[in-house]
């Protein structure tokens, strides 16, 4: 891996791999593509973290929970989005406002200050209490910012009308963009339409192959 602001030669590079794993309805193709990426990176010397909907579920299926010696994978939960399309947009807009404040050239804001942002106040009822949602946003952002690279595993997730798949990945790309973490995407199926959201997503990618 090339040197960047997040990497150092004194330790293994930390790579976050994002795939559709941890679903209680097992998706064999998505799981296989994600693990293929993770294994290739681990064999190359990377310290791999898998983003999942359920850490215990993934560790059980993959038989690769992180051990005391540092082997295996670490896990990071997805930031979950509401079902309604308008509410998903409100949530992503609030996340971007939080990121803007976190990366501003001034003292780091408190949770209370972030909760007071108009875009956060506009979040739907399903994401209340707002303090807990903002804490999850900040923890999510800090975890991704600590990575040296992010890899979004291939499949049809960016071509999906299931809102959680696209918006979960858009949120990862947004955090990586603000934190300056290189973002790579393995082969993806793409929709015919090109929305502003997807154009923003692809502009953040360092290497966007398609299938």
Go through the PLM ranges and name each one.
Residues 1-2, 211:
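Short intrinsically disordered, low-complexity coil segments enriched in acidic
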């Amino acid at each position: 891996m090339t040197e960047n602001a997040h990497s150092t030669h004194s330790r293994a590079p930390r790579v976050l791999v994002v795939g559709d794993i941890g679903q209680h309805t097992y998706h064999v193709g998505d799981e296989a593509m994600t693990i293929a990426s993770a294994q290739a990176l681990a064999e190359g010397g990377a310290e791999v973290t898998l983003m999942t909907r359920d850490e215990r579920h993934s560790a059980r299926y993959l038989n690769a929970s992180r051990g005391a010696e540092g082997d295996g994978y670490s896990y990071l939960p997805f930031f979950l989005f509401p079902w309604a399309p308008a509410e998903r947009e409100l949530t992503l807009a609030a996340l971007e406002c939080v990121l803007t404040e976190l990366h501003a050239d001034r003292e780091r804001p408190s949770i209370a200050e972030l909760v007071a942002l108009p875009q956060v106040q506009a979040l739907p009822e399903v994401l209340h209490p707002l303090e807990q949602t903002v804490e999850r946003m900040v923890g999510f952002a800090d975890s991704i910012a600590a990575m040296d690279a992010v890899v979004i595993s291939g499949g049809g997730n960016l071509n999906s009308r299931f809102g959680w798949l696209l918006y979960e990945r858009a949120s990862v790309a947004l955090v990586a963009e603000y934190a300056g973490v290189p973002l790579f995407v393995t082969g993806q199926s793409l929709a015919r339409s090109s929305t502003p959201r997807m154009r923003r997503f692809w502009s953040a990618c360092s290497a966007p192959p398609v299938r």
